[in-house]
Amino acid sequence: MDYLKYGIEVVVKKSEKRKFKLIDYKNIDKNTFFYLCEAEFKGNPKNSRPDITLFINGIPVVIIEAKATLKIDSHLEGISQIRRYEKFSPDLFRFVQFAISYGEEQLYTPTMPNWYKENIHLPAYYWRIRQKINGKKVVKDDIFYILNPSILLEIIRYFIFYRKDEYSKTKTLSKIIARYNQYFATKKAMKRIDEYLSGDSKNKGLIWHWQGSGKTYTMFFIANYFLDKYFSENPVIFFVVDRVDLERQSKEFYEAIQEKKFKTILKRIDSINKLYEVIKSIKMSELSNKVIVRGIYTTTIQKFQYERSKKEKDNNKEKDKDDEDLDLSKPIEEIIKKIEDKLKKEEKEGKIKGLKDLLIILAFIYLKHLKEKNPEEYKKHIENLKKLKDKDKKEEYLINLGNIKRKHILILIDEAHRTQYGILGGMRKITFPNAITFGFTGTPVFKNEKNTFTEFSYPEKGEFYLDVYFIGDSIKDKFTLPLTYQIVKEGDIKSEGIQITLDEEDIKEFIDEWIKRGEDINLFDRKKLPKYINKSKTILLNPKRIDKVAKYIVDRIEEDTENFKFKAMVVAVNRLGCVRFKKALDKYLKEKFGDEAEKWAEVVMTYHHNEEEKEIIEYMKKLKKERNSNDFNEINQIIREEFLNSENPKILIVTDMLLTGFDAPRLKVMYLDKPLYGHRLLQAIARTNRPYPDKEFGLIVDSVGLFKVLTETMALYNMLAEEEIREDFKNNLISSIDEIFQEFKLKLEMVKESLKNLKINDEDLSIDVNTLKTLTKNKDFNNNELKEKLDLIAFYAEDGKNARILKLIDDLKAVIKLYKALGSYPQKIFYIEDIELLSFIYAYLIKKLKPKKKSNRKFWEELISFIHNKMLVDDLTVIEEINLNPDDLDKILKENIGKREIKRAVANYYFILKNSILDKQHDPIYKEILERLERLRRDWIMKRIDDKIYLNAIKNLMELKNNYDKKIKGKSSIERIKESISTYIGENILKDQDIKLNLENTEKLITKMQNLNKLSKLQRKKFKKELSCALLEDLLKELKGKIKDEDAKKVAELSDNLVSEFILKEIWGENYENQ
C-alpha cells in the first residue's frame, strides 16, 4: 500500500536513492486507467478470475464481482467470492485495495492478502451520495461514484489504511476504508481549511454525526489529509478530549493506524507543563524559521488552564516575587530584563502559573525579538503599553502579543457538546486565535451558555453544521440499529399504579411524634417539602418499587436478551438506587436461575471516600472483600472490561458512568429507571444501537415515562435539519455572542461604578473592585475589611426596603449570569478576576440575607421511610400505545404565552406529529396528513397564516390521526388495508361520506399472496398487475351509483397508486421494489 501511496525508493548509485512514484496523484491525466474482464491471476488451489479488474498504470487496484441483480442476496455471494480470491491469490491483494460486489445490492469492501487462509471479517458498505432535488435533500446509492478516476485516487491516497492494535491481546492486522459519510465530512472539512488558508474568514466547523457512525476515524482522515497536504508548512494538530482515559485511548487508537508519517510525530501531552512546552515551541517557530514544530498531539481540554489551582498557588512560597516580576505598573524595559533573567529558572522549576502568565511571558520574548529585528515595531508596542494605565488592559495587550498567530494549526475536538464552553474553551481560543477548529458530536447542545452550534459553526450566517449524519441516516446504512421503545408502568393502564396512603394529617402526627421524643428539629416551610420529598426519593428510590421493577426485569430478561445472547443495562436514579437494584436483582436472579446468577449483575458507579449513605457504605465493604481491592476505580475498570469481553456480568447497573462514550456492541437492552433529558437521554439510549451478529434492534424499557421528552428532543434536533426552520431558529432563538459581550461589559462597568460610589445614610460603603483585584494578589491580603462592609450592606438591606441595595444585588446576579452566557468567548478571560470578586460579593450578601437553615438529615430520612411504608406499588405492565394529545395544544392556544414559546410550539408540534407517522407514510391517510402538514409548514414560513391558525390546524390533524388510529387499532393486516382504503375513498372521492368497503377480490388475492414464500421480481410484477385489476373491479362495483363518470377515471388512477404505494408496502415492506 505504501508503494501505491508514496512510491518505491530505489538505490541508483552506491550512495544515491531515488523515489519512483507508481501513481501521479497531482496530475491525474498522466496516469493510465483501464480494465479487463475475467483477467486470470495465479492462485492456489486454483487461479482467481474476478469479473472485472481495474488497473492504474498497469497495477490492479480494484476488482468487481458482478452477480444477477434479480437474485435475492446475490451481493452477499459476491462478497463471499471476493473473500475466496483473497485466500487463493493473496499476492494480488497486495495491490488491490478494495472490491465491489454488484448484485441485488451494491457494496464495496476493503481487501487484504489472506496468506494463512483464515476467516477474515472485513466490513462491506453502501456508497451513497447526497443531492438536492426540488429543494429537498435526497440520498441515493451510487457505487460508481468511487470509480471516478479523481475520486478513486483520493480514496487510495487518503481513505484506506491498515490497522494493527498493539495494545490488544491478538494484535490482529485489519484494513479500514472510509464510509461515504466520513469521506464527505472530510472533504467539507478540507474545503473549509483550504478556503481559510487562502484568505476566507471561516476557520471552524461542526461535524454532527450520530453515535456509532465512526467519528474517531473521520477525525483521523481529516488530520492525516491536512498533515500530508500542508506538510511543508510544518502543521500542528491537536486531538482534544475531556477525560484523561480518553486522552490515552485516543493516542492508542491513532497509533494503531499504520500511517508512518502520522505515527512518527504523534505524541501524548500528559501534563500541563508539556502543553506549555509545545505552545512555547510553536511561538518560537514564529520568530525563527530554523525551529520546526511539526507535530500531532492528544491532550485534554482541562490542561488549558487560566492559572494554577489554589493548592498549587498556596504551595508556591515565592508567590509574591513571581507576581512582582509580572507587575505591569513597572517600566516595560525593566520587566523584560527581569523576565529574561528568570525565564529559564521558572520553566525548569515549573512555576509558570497558568496559560495567562505563559502568554504574557511569550509576549516579552516576542518584544525582545522585535527589539533586535524590528526596532520600529518594538517602539510602537512599548508606546502603546505605556499609554495603557489600567493593568487589565496591559495584560490583554500582552496576551494578544504572546498568543500563537500561526494558521496551520488544526484542533479536532471530540464530544464537542461537553466541556468546551467556559474558561478552558476561552483559553484554548485566546491561545490559538487563528487555528482551524472542528467539533465532533452526535448530540449538540443549545442552552444559553452552552451552544454547540454557536461555538463551532456560524448559525448567524445560516450554517448550523458543516456536515450532518443523524439517526435516520445511520440506521438506513446499518451502521447503527433501530431502537424499540417500550413504556412500562406500575399497574394496568387505567390504575394508579402507585398510591401513597397518607395525608397531611399523617405527616403532622409524624412530626409531633418526633418532638415528643425530644429530637431537635428546625421549623420548615411547606414550600421546602418538594426539595426533600421529591419523585426520586419517594417513588424511584422506594425499596418496594425497586423490588417490583427488579422482579419485572428478571421475569423478562431472558426473552429480552434472547437467552442471554446479548447483555443488558439498568439505569438507576442515583447511586443509592444502584445499590438497591443490585440487592434486588441478585435475589430474583438467584431464585430463577440458581446460585451462579449472583455474579450476573454488577454496579459501575462513583464511590466517595467520605460516604454518608449507610447502604452504600455496606456495599463498598462487600465489594472490596469480593474483589480483594481497595481501589474502586480499578474495580470499575475490571467490571467494565468483563462486561465487554466475558460472559459475566450479563447486567450492568449504572446511574451516570457509562451512559456516554461506552461502546458495547453486545448490549441490547436498557432498563431506564432514571429521568434523563435532552442530549443526555439521546446519548444514553444510543448505548444499545451498536451492530452485533444477529442483533436486529436495541430495546429501551422505560419505567419513568420519558417518551414525550424523547419525542420533543428528537423534534428539536430534526428541526435543525430543515432549512426554513433553521432560518426561523436563527432569527428567533440565536443571540449574537458579540451583542451579549457588549451587554456584559456595560453591565459590569455599571455594577463596578455602583459599588465604588455606594453610600448609605452618609456612611461610606464603597468597594473599589479594581483596587481589590490588585490587593488580593498580595499574600498578606486580609479580607476582613471587605466583609465588614458587606455585613453593613446586608444589614441595611435586611428589611427588604432599601431599593438601591436590592437593585445592586439583582445587577450583580445579572452580570454573573451574562458572563456565564458568554460560554468560551475568548475575551471573557480578561474579566475572570472581576467576576471572581463580584461572585464572592454576591454570594456573601445572599448568604447573609437568605441564610440556609440546617436540615436535620435523620428527620428527612425517617420521614421518607415513613412515606415508603405507606406506599402501595402494583406490578409493572407494558403500555403498548402512545397517543398524541391535542389537548396540550388547546392549552397553548388559550393561554397568553410569549412569542418565543409560540415559535417553539410551532416547530415542536410539527415534528411531534410528523415523527409519529413518518415510518407509516405509505398508508394513504397518514400520507395525506403529512402532505397537509407540509403545506401548513410552508404557509406559515411564507407568512400566509399566523401562529394560531397554524396551531389550530395542527390540532385538527392530530385529532384526525388519533381517530384513524382508533379505527385500525388491533386489526389484522388485511382489515387495516380495507379500513384505510374505505376512509380514504370516503374523504377524497365521496367527500367526507362514511363507507365500509368489502373489497372481496382484493382480499382473496392478498390472502393468497401471504401464504406464498418469496417471489421473484417477475412474479411480483405479475401479482402487482393482478392486484391492481382486482382492486379496480372491487371499487367500481361497490361505488356504482355513488360516483359520477368523471370520478371513475380518478378511481382507476387511484387503484394503481394504492396498490404500489400502499398495499404492497404493507405486505412486503417499504423497500419491496429493491428486494
UniProtKB/Swiss-Prot annotation:
Q: What is this protein called?
A: Putative type I restriction enzyme MjaVIIP endonuclease subunit
Pfam families linked? HSDR_N, SWI2_SNF2, T1R_D3-like
Which GO molecular function terms does the record list? ATP binding; DNA binding; helicase activity; type I site-specific deoxyribonuclease activity
- How does this protein assemble? The type I restriction/modification system is composed of three polypeptides R, M and S.
Q: Which residues cross the membrane?
A: none
Residue spans making up a coiled coil are none
Protein family membership: Belongs to the HsdR family.
Q: SMART domains given for it?
A: DEXDc
